[in-house]
Structures are given as structure tokens and as C-alpha cells.
Amino acid sequence: MGRDSADVMIADGKNTLITVGLNDDVVDAELACYHKWKDQPRNLVAGMHGSIDQKCEAVFAYLTEHVVYKLDDAGNQYIKSPARLLQDGCGDCKSLTMFIACCLHCLGIEHIIRFVNYDGGTQYTHVYPVAIDEMGREIVLDACEKDTDGVILYDYARPSKRQKDFRLL
């Protein structure tokens, strides 16, 4: 992934999709956007080789080097395309998930978009992608989780009270 993202993906200049509604609306919008944008980073990941874990590490490292996590403004739910996320340089869990899931699709890696809740309530409060490796093992790609020193954690998921998985590819 040594390519310049500006050479391979161009944000269309339009406003990011905004959904304001019920929790299911956000889940539906995330999945609809995935199907719309899933091929967008194809040129960005072209030529990547190695095991599924090596490819996942490369995608994860690229994202965390070029984008910072930023919570959406209160009351708004933004879902950014991979190109828009890279252009803006920041996004929340929905946009980070979108970027990684689209890269996994382009690499032919089976994956899950996982919606979770940490407090036991009825609303999903976080989303992250999970890759499935050659042995069927899950590789968690939550680019929002950090250790106590602020280092983003690869292949780590905080225990959740509730989850809903959407298996893709």
C-alpha cells in the first residue's frame, strides 16, 4: 500500500452521507454504503501479497497512519466513503470500518461488519470489521481501540454485552 491515495481514489466533493434516525437506520445505512463503495479502494490495495493476517496488518497500519478517530458531532451520523475518509483525515467508527471492510473486499478476504453494545442496552453503540483468516480465525480490526499509552490495538476487541454480525464476501 505504498501508493499515494490521491492517485487511486478521488472523493467526489459531495457531502458525506448523513443519517439521523433509529439505530436500525444506521445499521442499514452502513451496509448500503458498503455495497455502494466496496470496490473503491481496489487500486490502493492492488499488489498486496502475503497471508491474510499480513494483508490485514498492512491495511490497518495504512489506515492508522493516515486517519485519526474523531467522534461524530452530537446528533449526526456520518458514513464516509474510503476516498472521503482519506481526504478528510478523520472519521468515526462507521467510517473507519467502511474503509477497512472495503479494502478486505478488494483483497478477497472474507469479513464481518460487527455492531456491538457495551452497556447491555438495546442500541448498538460501536461498529468494527473482523477478517476471517485461512484457518477460520477472527482478526479484529477495530481502529478505535487504544492501550493506556494511546497506541491503537491490532486484533483486539473489548468485551461487549451484545453484538450483531453481518458476514460479507
Predicted regions and their residues:
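A structural boundary/capping signal
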Residues: 1-169
